[in-house]
């Protein structure tokens, strides 16, 4: 569960390392976001010569959370870190590589690009 002020790792090669959630998108009173949800982020730490700079604001999709996601068969998939992938205004990833596993819950028309770039789909 990600809320405003949550710090996330960035799991792509856009140049960002850490990001902070500044808004959960999808409703005026929505408080929490989980895996597959889109949030607004501010870049808090970035590498030199990356595609994004510190302080810039982007959309991002959450791909891993410590809270995890519950499947219909009763299993729960949890991760050690909270992680996101930076998106442009057309909801396409800025980076060309994804680091670490992603869950099957991202498999819809919007995020098939992320699924295809990921090294492992759980």
Curated annotation (Swiss-Prot):
Q: Which residues form a coiled coil?
A: none
A single Gene Ontology biological process assigned to it is:
translation
Molecular function (GO) terms for this protein are: large ribosomal subunit rRNA binding; structural constituent of ribosome
The keyword Membrane is assigned to this record: no
Q: How does it assemble?
A: Part of the 50S ribosomal subunit. Forms a cluster with proteins L3 and L19. In the 70S ribosome, L14 and L19 interact and together make contacts with the 16S rRNA in bridges B5 and B8.
Family membership noted in the UniProt record: Belongs to the universal ribosomal protein uL14 family.
Name of the featured protein: Large ribosomal subunit protein uL14
Task: Name its species.
Answer: Buchnera aphidicola subsp. Baizongia pistaciae (strain Bp)
Q: Which gene encodes it?
A: rplN
């Amino acid at each position: 569960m990600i809320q405003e002020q949550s710090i996330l790792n960035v799991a792509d090669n856009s140049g960002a390392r850490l990001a902070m959630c500044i808004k959960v998108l999808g409703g005026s009173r929505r408080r929490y976001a989980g895996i597959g949800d889109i949030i607004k982020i501010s870049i808090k730490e970035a590498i030199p010569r990356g595609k994004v700079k510190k302080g810039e604001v982007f959309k991002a999709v959450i791909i891993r959370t410590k809270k995890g996601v519950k499947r219909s068969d009763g299993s729960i998939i949890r991760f050690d870190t909270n992680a996101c992938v930076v998106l442009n205004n057309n909801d396409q990833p800025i980076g060309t590589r994804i680091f670490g596993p992603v869950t099957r819950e991202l498999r819809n028309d919007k995020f098939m690009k992320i699924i295809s770039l990921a090294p492992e789909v759980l």
